[in-house]
Structure formats: C-alpha cells, structure tokens
Amino acid sequence: MHCVLARILLWFLIVDLSVIRALVLPPLKDYDPLEPLMKRDMAMGQRNRFKVDGQLPPILNSTDVTDDQRSLHTPGEIPSYVINHCPLVHLYSEEKYWPSDIAEYVQNFQIKDKNGNSISTHENLTLHDLKAEYHVDLFGNKTETHIPSSEVFLTSLDDFDKDPKWLLGHLPEYGTGYNSKAPAILIVVDKGNGWVDAFWFFFYPFNHGPFIMGHGPWGNHVGDWEHSLVRFYKGIPKYLWMSAHSSGTGYRYEAVEKFKKLRKRKQQDSDDGGDTILERPLIFSARGTHANYASAGQHAHDIPFFFMPLSDFTDRGPLWDPSLNFYSYTFDGKTVTPSSEREESLGLDWLHFQGGWGDQQLPARDPRQKWCVAQWKYIGGPRGPLFKKLDRLNLCGGVKKWNFWNGGCPARRLIKKAEGLDSESTDLMGDNCGVLLYRIRPKWLRGILRFLMWRGILCSLMEFFTN
C-alpha cells in the first residue's frame, strides 16, 4: 500500500514539474536552433519543391534534357565532386549481414520463374547471365518460350535459413572504411540546367526483418538493395535523400551531420595540391533491415507515437566508405554508360534485369515460413538499381500516400531525432514537431503546445506534412 501511495505522489510530482517547465522555460529560452532559416523560407513563400530558392532553374526529367541544358557533357565520366561528397555509412555495431559484392553474390544462385521452372542453363552464374528477357525451352520440345525477367527470381542453391557463409557479407576495414569485397554501385543522372543526381546503391546479401513486440523477425528476404541520393547544383550538394524500406527521408544537405575524412591525392591527378580533408555526410544503417537514417537511436517504422511496436535501430558502428570501392555508371534515362573497363567487364545486361535479387516468397506450406497479422517471415527479393525511379524530379522515390502536402516529400531542415538509449542530441536536430510551431506567437504559447504535443499524434502529423 505504501509503495502504491509513493508511486502516486511521485507521478504527481513529475507532472507538476513538467507543467512548470512547459509554462516557465519556453518563454525564457526558445528551442529553435534554425529559426532564422525558417523565417527566411516563410518570407520567400517558397512552394516549388524542385527549387532551392527562387534563383535556381527547374530540375528536368533526364530524357527531356537537350544538349544545351546538359550538366554532364561526356557519357561515362564521373565528376570528382560526386566522389568527394559520397555519404559515409555507419553500419550497426551488432550487424550480422554486412555489405557484399553482387558479382560474388550471384554465383550462389540459379534463375527460376514463379512456377519453379529453371531458367538458367548452367551453375555458377555471373552478372552476364542476368538479362532483361529470356528465351528458354521449358518443356523439351525444342520450342522456346519468351519469359520477361520481371517474372523470374534468383533462387538460392543453399538453404538461406541456415546462414551460409556467402549470406553474411563482408565487414569494412577498421579506420579507413575500405571494403575490398563489397563495391557499391554509383549511377549518376543528368537532370539538366546544372542539376546532377548521384545515386549510391548499397547491396547486402540478406535483409533481416524487424521484430514486432518481441516476436519475429518478419519481412526477411534474400538480397537487399538500399540507396541514397545526393542532388547537386553546379557541383554544390543541395539535397540528400536516404532510403528506408519502401520509402525514405529527404534532407537539405546542410542539415545532415558531416564527418571529416582525408582524401589522398592520386598520382594521376593533374591539379596542384596535396591531400584534402573533406566533410562527408553521415548515414546510419539500421540493424538487419539496413534502412537508412540521419541519426543514431530507435526509429519508429510505422507507428511513431507513444507505442512503437515496430522499430529500426541505428548506432555509430563500423564506418563504411563506399567511395573507396565502387562500380560507376552514367544514365541519361535511356542509355547506361560504364565509367571504366572494370564496369565494362561486368556487362550492362544485369542492370536491365527486372527480376527479384533473391528467392521468391516462400509458400505457406514451407516449414521455414511463418505468418503474423501483417507480414510473412520470408518475402520475395527486391528489384535492382535501375528500377528505383532514377528519373525522379521529386527528391523521394515516391509520394507518401498520407502526405499530399508539398508533393509528399519536402526536404527536412532538421534531423529527425531518434528515441532510445542510443539517441543523441545535436544542434542539427529538431524536436520532431513540424515547422508549423514556428508560426505560433507568442513564444510562451508555442512552448505550451510543444509540451502538449511531445510524441503525440498531432505533433507527428505536423512532422509528416511540414518536416
């Protein structure tokens, strides 16, 4: 009885102190580190989501860019500023499935259609075996059947449920972030009028899905493509977008945390000067799912309110530098051009492969398969880089269904703060309430509303609509 009374008194004390803090502290100290930037944007009446400000030209679809509008004039040539601003990736400290090389990965598969018929004619696949379409004699009657690659899957030769060695990937080198066995994929797209999009793709052999209230994992799949987009205007980075599951988050480039890293000058570089220290953007890769976030901590997957049963977790684990090992290409909306002989040796057909980069979803009768209300344990593998909407004008790969405001993808001006023990607070982080709060005056009223909306539904709705 005494314990119950003590808990009740403690609860009232906490509530009283919280109310006093909400009523007294906000008028004395306003927690809006980038309020001048907000005021500037509001004064400009900025509504065009394809412009940084009223002085910059529009972004064009890559297929509509004329010769006079081109930002890149030599197919296959990768600008140095793209490499210099490549994101660094903090992998999770307890990660089990690390990055891998797609050329090594495909050797462990055969190609099958959705009915289980074998499409590949030999073992030890290479990237040259991945094509846009196939013509196969399925029934042994010397009649070829046309099968589009969208109807096939890479099917494991081993039981992936037992974690064969090739499924685990490779850990980057400590200190440098170099990963000799896991090249990233870089695709640079000319968006005209000085705009250039640099897509960095990160490949992991396996996606280990999240747990729901301690049960799972759910949504596992063999093969996992994640990516980030750095959008440049005349060589200056303006935006950064990072994928997370079927969507992602876009940021103004200045809003994202940076990491100083040394870039050694190569002997063949003709310009003067020695080694250079560059400020590179940081991305945090979530445990198992490899979803990308801009901060460390717990990130709500679908339900971002008081109750977060489905979450991703990030921390400052091993640092991976994709710019030290990558395959690179340029893409004009129609033609892919390799940047060197290394990429030419891999061929280009694999980029046009529309099939799943992992096994088809296991049937319910398979003993490895399990089901929960919203998800299966094992789902089908993802599609490859060329089918991630590289021709997008919007910063995001797609518009969030619930967010029609500002095109569904406004670029955030503050990092969305995570929850949990690994979460951090910096001057770049917002309080997870939308910029609608910045319009409220007087400040003491804003402070009260900020307190009342802390991790509340209304606050999260504003975050969705205003960033």
From Swiss-Prot:
The keyword Transport is assigned to this record: yes
Annotated glycosylation sites: N61, N124, N141
Main location: membrane
Gene null: resulting phenotype: Leads to cell death when overexpressing the camptothecin mimetic TOP1-T(722)A mutant.
Classification via InterPro entries: VPS_Associated
GO cellular component: cell periphery; fungal-type vacuole; membrane
Localization per Swiss-Prot or TrEMBL: Membrane
Membrane spanning stretches: 8-28
Sorted UniProt keywords: Glycoprotein, Membrane, Protein transport, Transmembrane, Transmembrane helix, Transport
Biological processes per GO annotation: protein transport
Membrane disposition: Single-pass membrane protein
Induction: By 8-methoxypsoralen and UVA.
Family designation: Belongs to the VPS62 family.
Protein purpose: Involved in vacuolar protein sorting.
Protein name: Putative vacuolar protein sorting-associated protein TDA6
Organism: Saccharomyces cerevisiae (strain ATCC 204508 / S288c)
